[in-house]
Amino acid sequence: MKLTWIKCMRKTEKMNDIDEPRLFEETGIEAFVAALVIPLLKPLDFRLVRVKLLGQNGLTLQIMVERADGSMTIEDCETVSRTVSHLLDVQNVIERKYHLEISSPGIDRPLVRKSDFFHWQGHIAKIETKITIDGRKKFRGILANITQEGLTLNTDKAAYGEAMYIAIPFDNIIDAHLVLTDELIRNALKKNKDLSQQFISEDNPNVSKQLSNYKN
């Protein structure tokens, strides 16, 4: 790997316990990578959000992380990159040439833990379920009535005949993420005044920094 692509938000929103389990996990190669990196992240006070293998613009292995105490600096992203990249090379997880991308969750973040849903209650999210509810598996709406068992999604764009309120248990969710809206951006920018992106060349210790807005 010649290039590591790092996307990082400064001062990310405060999260809860680093040991809080995720609601859903990866499969295949992504699950293997997750199993490798989680033990490396925890002693450094990081926790895994997700692992995703992307095919756009070549092969990219995205490892999305966050700190449990709510902070996530560019230096933190660099630390994670240095910590996991050597092990991934030694394990030869992906035989093809690929880019390693270390990323913080971003504004329209995935919702992978119960605390994520509690924290972002009142914002719009897209949710996909394992089992159909009212003949559907994909939903969009405002997160509401969050409990330890599940949530209510107040659909903001319900078609004629569709229910306005959908009760979704956590154990039926396979994917969920926030929808980028003006309100979400305003809320996030109050917590994250500086969104940063940067490339780190493994052959060059110098880091070039470029500030820009980041969308997953």
Swiss-Prot record:
Entry annotated with the keyword Metal-binding: no
CDD domains: YlxS_C (cd01734)
Gene3D superfamilies registered for this protein in UniProt: Ribosome maturation factor RimP, C-terminal domain, RimP-like superfamily, N-terminal
Entry GO CC: cytosol
InterPro entries for this protein: Ribosome_maturation_RimP (IPR003728), RimP_C (IPR028998), RimP_C_sf (IPR036847), RimP_N (IPR028989), RimP_N_sf (IPR035956)
Annotated disulfide bonds: none
Compartmental location: Cytoplasm
Keyword Phosphoprotein set for record: no
GO biological process, one term: translation
Keywords attached to this entry: Cytoplasm, Ribosome biogenesis
Pfam family, one: RimP_N
SUPFAM superfamilies, A to Z: YhbC-like, C-terminal domain, YhbC-like, N-terminal domain
Chain's role: Required for maturation of 30S ribosomal subunits.
Similarity annotation: Belongs to the RimP family.
UniProt-recorded name of the protein: Ribosome maturation factor RimP
Source species taxonomy: Bacteria, Pseudomonadati, Pseudomonadota, Alphaproteobacteria, Hyphomicrobiales
